[in-house]
Amino acid sequence: MEGVMSEAPQSSIRKKEYEARMSRIRSRQEKEFRERKSANARYAEETTEKLLNKYYEQEREILEKKSSMKNGFYVPKEAEFFAVILIRSKCNCPPKVRKVLELFRLKRINTCVLVRNNKSTRKMLQIIKDHVAFGTIGMELLRKLVYTKGSGRNGHVRVKLTNEFIEDMFDGKIRCIEELVHHIYNGTEMFKKVNSFLYPFHLSPPRGGFKGQKSKSFNDGGSVGNHQDLLSNLLERMI
């Protein structure tokens, strides 16, 4: 008696067809993502070179202007933003101080945020000056801060900065980390959106510790308050 081969159940056939179709879709998506990642990497490299060249050209023009002013006094352009670091606990602080710290998203010790330099911000900094160190920083330190400690916000989730994540969050208007730095440093119309996207920077305690008594004003040999353009001395040791 000859054996009769039974046909595979229709459900099994449909399952195999589905798995094969999904495998093709995954392969296509992976290929598209690799191509996108490669294109974004090229874009980031070209954009970084272009923006840095523009910045260094501006710096050269400033140096030339300084050297040409023999008897005059060069007044540098006011910084577009402040870096603000929470270095003292908010426990037992007045409600007004706590409110400003919350507005600045300063929730834990050794957290740094960037805020636009304007009249309103300067008033708020005076309210919290006994709990924070703040001042201005240069392009190189800003780049180091964003590249090494930067992360982005997706809803309430903290996400590592990648070109693809940035591109998705800004609908292609911004595609790399260097463009984030550019908008912050130059205070462009995208400053607010970029700054809201960046998660507060979580820093380490400063190498070598704080100079003097931390609770004393920077002008009196301590650490809190306005460091002006000397904040980089502290921030560099916390990155």
UniProtKB/Swiss-Prot annotation:
| Top-level taxon of the source organism | Eukaryota
- Disulfide bond entries: none
Coiled coil ranges:
none
Quote the InterPro entries the UniProt record gives.
Answer: Ribo_uL30_ferredoxin-like_sf, Ribosomal_uL30, Ribosomal_uL30_euk_arc, Ribosomal_uL30_ferredoxin-like
**One Pfam short name:** Ribosomal_L30
List, in alphabetical order, the GO biological process terms annotated in this UniProt record: maturation of LSU-rRNA from tricistronic rRNA transcript (SSU-rRNA, 5.8S rRNA, LSU-rRNA)
One GO cellular component from the entry?
Answer: cytosolic large ribosomal subunit
Gene3D superfamilies in the record = 1.10.15.30, Ribosomal protein L30, ferredoxin-like fold domain (3.30.1390.20)
| Keyword list, A-Z | Ribonucleoprotein, Ribosomal protein
Where are the residues of the annotated region Disordered? Answer: 1-22
Supply the CDD domains for this chain: Ribosomal_L7_archeal_euk
Asked if Ribonucleoprotein is a keyword of the record, the answer is yes
A GO MF annotation of the entry reads:
RNA binding
The UniProt similarity line reads: Belongs to the universal ribosomal protein uL30 family.
Q: Which PANTHER family match?
A: 60S RIBOSOMAL PROTEIN L7 (PTHR11524), LARGE RIBOSOMAL SUBUNIT PROTEIN UL30 (PTHR11524:SF16)
This protein is called Large ribosomal subunit protein uL30
**Species of provenance:** Encephalitozoon cuniculi (strain GB-M1) (Microsporidian parasite)
> Gene encoding this polypeptide?
RPL7
